[in-house]
């Protein structure tokens, strides 16, 4: 676009400023998602994006907020471009704000390539089925809710639960075993407090994990509009590293609830008709557009795996945010307040947790041939032990049979030995499966009906087996 075009698309016709939005009248040729440059009456430069166009009226969201803007002397220039981010492998080890500007004191990135942050949809016929195991070092995920390369597996948490610690541990420990390809982590934080931001930064820097991590950080006191851009910046960076540089990328996004609250705030400012619990009706489409940027493409070496984290309001798994997320993603890892109260970390409740693509990433040649059977048997035994624990609270332990007492003991040991691990404990998949077998040895061998007999003979610690 030449200078004349730029000049003719500069307007001082702002008619309204409301919340994060401003309305510009008399606009020619404005387009949805177009980037605008804003000059405040004090001469400060800001950036915005067109949200809506109707005839000659454009509604613009301002990334840095609308404070100090007025309807008399605010200048708005329409650039004819969509939001883009300059990308380079030098972004690994760097920290950016929610709109991609460095905030770690380092130099600006010299980009190898610029990409639209809205991404381009993957052709469904070009998608490759997610496969290959990603080891997180956490037994409840690796052993029973396996994360597979190219999958989207959210973590459902509650206020006050240690999801931040779990996210940092996964970012630090995650790896693709038996692969020579490079592995990277993109960490996108939305609406987090300064205390949480300091925790993540200290965690990444002190453990040396930052060198393979790119961080996009939007704080709670940053504009809500920036919160909408943060996951787009993170996912565009992931697409560049995965599909242009052939890396395996794990994207951790926290907190999706804050992202959806920002959607609701902007929707309210636009006077849109609200949907369930005040959230916009297009929230499902918006979340799907974000989650579906995970995956693998035929002929491409790299992959994008997503682990979004969301805090369920009032621990309500039927709330629209976890509800819609569950429709789109391929399972969920659920954190339990009850386990957290007993001091167990990570407090993963395996019974409502699920990885729908687990079968594609486990077994001989990927993890171990007994993995599926061990997982099924652990689920069955723990579920029965939990039921017996509830029964014991009613009838007392004296009413239980010897068999029942063994399942009850198994449930206690499972929580204390398998679920519980320290925040810096990185268990291999072999250690996780061996631990599972050790716990199953508490039960009579005749109860191990979900594992093939040959694996029982091969892996069950014989000295501890009770017939």
Swiss-Prot record:
Pfam family, one: ATP-synt_VA_C
Keywords: ATP synthesis, Cell membrane, Hydrogen ion transport, Ion transport, Membrane, Transport
One BP annotation, GO: proton motive force-driven plasma membrane ATP synthesis
GO molecular function annotations of the record: ATP binding; proton-transporting ATP synthase activity, rotational mechanism
Coiled-coil ranges from the UniProt annotation: none
Cellular component, GO annotation: plasma membrane; proton-transporting two-sector ATPase complex, catalytic domain
NCBIfam families in the cross-refs: ATP_syn_B_arch, PRK04196.1
Family from the record: Belongs to the ATPase alpha/beta chains family.
Summary of the function given for this chain in its UniProt record: Component of the A-type ATP synthase that produces ATP from ADP in the presence of a proton gradient across the membrane. The B chain is a regulatory subunit.
Protein's recorded name: A-type ATP synthase subunit B
Protein encoded by which gene: atpB
């Amino acid at each position: 676009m030449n200078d004349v075009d730029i000049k003719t698309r500069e307007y001082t016709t702002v008619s309204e400023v409301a919340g994060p939005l401003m309305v510009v009248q008399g606009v020619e040729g404005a387009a949805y998602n177009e980037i605008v440059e804003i000059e405040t009456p004090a001469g400060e430069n800001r950036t915005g994006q067109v949200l809506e166009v109707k005839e000659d009226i454009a509604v613009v969201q301002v990334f840095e907020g609308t404070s100090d803007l007025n309807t008399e002397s605010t200048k708005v220039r329409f650039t004819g471009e969509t939001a883009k981010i300059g990308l380079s492998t030098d972004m690994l080890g760097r920290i950016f704000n929610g709109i991609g500007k460095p905030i770690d004191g380092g130099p600006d990135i010299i980009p190898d390539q610029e990409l639209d942050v809205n991404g381009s949809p993957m052709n469904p016929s070009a998608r490759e089925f997610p496969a290959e195991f990603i080891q997180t070092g956490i037994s409840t995920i690796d052993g029973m809710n396996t994360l597979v390369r190219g999958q989207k597996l959210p973590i459902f948490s509650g206020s006050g639960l240690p999801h931040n610690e779990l996210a940092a541990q996964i970012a630090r420990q995650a790896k693709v075993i038996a692969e020579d390809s490079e592995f990277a982590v993109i960490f996108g934080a939305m609406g987090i407090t300064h205390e949480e931001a300091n925790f993540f930064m200290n965690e990444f820097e002190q453990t040396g994990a930052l060198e393979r991590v790119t961080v996009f950080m939007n704080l709670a006191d940053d504009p809500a509009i920036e919160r909408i851009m943060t996951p787009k910046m993170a996912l565009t960076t992931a697409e560049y590293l995965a599909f242009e540089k052939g890396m395996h990328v794990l994207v951790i996004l926290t907190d999706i609830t804050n992202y959806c609250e920002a959607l609701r705030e902007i929707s309210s400012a636009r006077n849109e008709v609200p949907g369930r619990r005040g959230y916009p009706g297009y929230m499902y489409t918006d979340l799907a557009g974000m989650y579906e940027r995970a995956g693998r493409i035929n002929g491409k070496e790299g992959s994008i795996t997503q682990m979004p984290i969301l805090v369920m309001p009032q621990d309500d798994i039927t709330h629209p945010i976890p509800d819609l997320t569950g429709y789109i993603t391929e399972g969920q890892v659920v954190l339990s307040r009850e386990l957290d109260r007993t001091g167990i970390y990570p407090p993963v409740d395996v019974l409502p947790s699920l990885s729908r693509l687990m079968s594609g990433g486990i077994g001989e040649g990927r993890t171990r041939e007994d993995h599926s059977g061990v997982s099924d048997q652990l689920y069955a035994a723990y579920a029965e032990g939990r039921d017996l624990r509830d029964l014991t609270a009613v009838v007392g332990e004296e009413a239980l049979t010897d068999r029942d007492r063994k399942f009850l003991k198994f449930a206690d040991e499972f929580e204390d030995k398998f679920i519980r691990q320290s925040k810096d404990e990185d268990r291999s998949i072999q250690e996780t499966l061996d631990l599972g077998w050790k716990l199953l040895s508490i039960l009579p061998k005749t109860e191990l009906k979900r594992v093939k007999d040959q694996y029982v003979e091969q892996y069950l610690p014989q000295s501890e087996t009770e017939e």
